[in-house]
Amino acid sequence: WHTGSNKNIAMSILYRPQKDAKNLDGLTIKIAEILKQAMQENYNIKLTIKEPNDLMLNKKKICGILTESNTIGNKINYVIISIGFNVNEKEFPKELENIATSLYKETGKEFDKEKIIKILIKSLENII
């Protein structure tokens, strides 16, 4: 994954939900669905999901999602959700030009990263 200085979102969120481990089933896809819906509702941007963990825009990768979890018995100890989202990237390395994109490259506009982060976090509040 590639990110320019202060242009994109690269974040990890730690949850300690104290819930049953069965809530982890299909978690990455659930997160992708929620992020896809949030971008549609807030920006009218239609992303697609490429399993197992990517969001695509115009057949190019714009976002990647990774999850890591730890359980104790049948209870969730913690979940880490990591999201890399290409927001205001204007140029990609040559090897990524045909497979990666950003909101800026697709729309020609700069986006407020902090606003997007708030939307993503709010959207994920009840994920587990």
Regions found by a protein language model. Give the residues of each.
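Long, positively charged amphipathic alpha-helical accessory segments at protein N-termini or as interdomain linkers
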Residues: K19-L47, L57-I128
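DPxDG-like acidic metal-binding loop motif
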Residues: W1-K19, L27-I31
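Short loop/edge segments at beta-strand edges and connector loops
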Residues: I49-E51
